[in-house]
Amino acid sequence: MVRTMLQGKLHRVKVTQSDLNYEGSCAIDQDFLNAAGILQYEAIDIYNVDNGQRFSTYAIAAEPGSKIISVNGAAARCACVGDTLIICSYVQIPDEQARTHHPRVVYFEGANQMKRLAKSVPVQVA
């Protein structure tokens, strides 16, 4: 059996640009991509914390150190400048490997400041 598992996550980044007329994709600071292990042109799912929209696109690299998160093309209708996003990539791996798999989770605060890197999502408690 093959399972689809969380591979990389950018948690609570802020949209810095939104360009309806760009040909598509989501431009992400190359440093952020590296931290989460997301490759340029890799499929990503985006979850907008502010409006509940969930959509899929692909990642393209923005200049390292720029802190850019630019939602482009048709997806620009799903996110406005200042919105808080969760950006995820997934990997398909055999069941045996899935049981010991650890994602790369990057937490952000403020104006796209990387806060910390983790290898798991915290257990939710009551």
Curated annotation (Swiss-Prot):
Ligand binding (substrate): 57, 73-75
InterPro entries, per database record: Asp_de-COase-like_dom_sf, Asp_decarbox
EC number: 4.1.1.11
Gene Ontology biological process terms from the UniProt entry: alanine biosynthetic process; pantothenate biosynthetic process
Active-site residues annotated for this sequence: 25 (schiff-base intermediate with substrate), 58 (proton donor)
Catalytic activity: L-aspartate + H(+) = beta-alanine + CO2
Cofactor(s) listed: pyruvate
Subcellular location: Cytoplasm
Note describing how the cofactor binds: Binds 1 pyruvoyl group covalently per subunit.
MF annotations from Gene Ontology: aspartate 1-decarboxylase activity
Listed pathway(s): Cofactor biosynthesis; (R)-pantothenate biosynthesis; beta-alanine from L-aspartate: step 1/1
PTM notes: Is synthesized initially as an inactive proenzyme, which is activated by self-cleavage at a specific serine bond to produce a beta-subunit with a hydroxyl group at its C-terminus and an alpha-subunit with a pyruvoyl group at its N-terminus.
Chain's role: Catalyzes the pyruvoyl-dependent decarboxylation of aspartate to produce beta-alanine.
HAMAP family the UniProt entry points to: PanD (MF_00446)
Protein name: Aspartate 1-decarboxylase
Lineage of producing organism: Bacteria, Pseudomonadati, Pseudomonadota, Gammaproteobacteria, Enterobacterales
Gene: panD
